[in-house]
């Protein structure tokens, strides 16, 4: 029996911030001979994405409760119980040596099912503020890890696993050496875009004129509107795309990034070694603010809460950063990153499976 490969079940779903780090760890362990299956939901992004990575996926029925009506809240205990039963049946079939919770609603019943079967639970919190699911799963987990300090009081800080092509980028002092001309500004709103970026950055471009060149990722369905906004501001030369398929190439091109501060975005920007202007999504727990704060504290970024993200403030900030200042910020960003996060998480999963 000792010669059989170890088995891991990854529990992650809903958003790329949960799924992509889970995939990085899964591939790392699969390369070491592990058998990996995924626990997710059939109506979220993992349903299509995970099988494309050569990983079998099992589904349970669960969704979030935030913003739902009274009837949904009253039905929640039964829904969670049913999801727990589904997850428990899946794990009894697969018999994982360890489960890895990377976040999303699926981790709740999945983690509870594993615990009830005596399967060790390893948690990884991607954000600077722990989500509700991980807050209570931490009470039964064998190990809890965190990407940023402060999500849990005593958890090891291991960073966020990021894509290998981002980690493979040359260091800032190599990549940016000898670069001149207009400052290259990469604007990233995510797959859904960010209205505040789409509305503000064309006017910022008008103020800065030919001192900047912009690559603006607008999000689904917004490309034409944003192109028209740049043209209306007298700046039609800037590049607008709905999506960016190769983020590593975009990071390599950029001198500075303007973006939201989701956990994975912040970790990728640090790993790439890039200065940033972060505009945290407004949420009551200020999760994205806390994600970005370590980079601002390191002198690698500037945070603008959304009400302060004005044309004047952003234009003045960008105009005030020389190429020398941007290189210093880029080096500070890289210094904050934890480029071996994938290996750290995988190593802890392996350790727990052996004990």
Swiss-Prot record:
It is found in: Cell inner membrane. Pathway: Cell wall biogenesis; peptidoglycan biosynthesis. InterPro entries: GlcNAc_MurG, Glyco_trans_28_C, GlycoTrans_28_N. It is a peripheral membrane protein. Its main location: membrane. One of its GO terms (cellular component) is plasma membrane. Gene3D superfamilies: Glycogen Phosphorylase B (3.40.50.2000). GO terms for molecular function: UDP-N-acetyl-D-glucosamine:N-acetylmuramoyl-L-alanyl-D-glutamyl-meso-2,6-diaminopimelyl-D-alanyl-D-alanine-diphosphoundecaprenol 4-beta-N-acetylglucosaminlytransferase activity; undecaprenyldiphospho-muramoylpentapeptide beta-N-acetylglucosaminyltransferase activity. It is an enzyme of class 2 (transferase). One of its GO terms (biological process) is cell wall organization. Keywords: Cell cycle, Cell division, Cell inner membrane, Cell membrane, Cell shape, Cell wall biogenesis/degradation, Glycosyltransferase, Membrane, Peptidoglycan synthesis, Transferase. It catalyses: di-trans,octa-cis-undecaprenyl diphospho-N-acetyl-alpha-D-muramoyl-L-alanyl-D-glutamyl-meso-2,6-diaminopimeloyl-D-alanyl-D-alanine + UDP-N-acetyl-alpha-D-glucosamine = di-trans,octa-cis-undecaprenyl diphospho-[N-acetyl-alpha-D-glucosaminyl-(1->4)]-N-acetyl-alpha-D-muramoyl-L-alanyl-D-glutamyl-meso-2,6-diaminopimeloyl-D-alanyl-D-alanine + UDP + H(+). Its EC number is 2.4.1.227. CDD domains: GT28_MurG. UDP-N-acetyl-alpha-D-glucosamine binds at residues 15-17, 127, 163, 191, 244, 263-268, 288. Pfam families: Glyco_tran_28_C (PF04101), Glyco_transf_28 (PF03033). Cell wall formation. Catalyzes the transfer of a GlcNAc subunit on undecaprenyl-pyrophosphoryl-MurNAc-pentapeptide (lipid intermediate I) to form undecaprenyl-pyrophosphoryl-MurNAc-(pentapeptide)GlcNAc (lipid intermediate II). Belongs to the glycosyltransferase 28 family. MurG subfamily. This is UDP-N-acetylglucosamine--N-acetylmuramyl-(pentapeptide) pyrophosphoryl-undecaprenol N-acetylglucosamine transferase. The gene is murG.
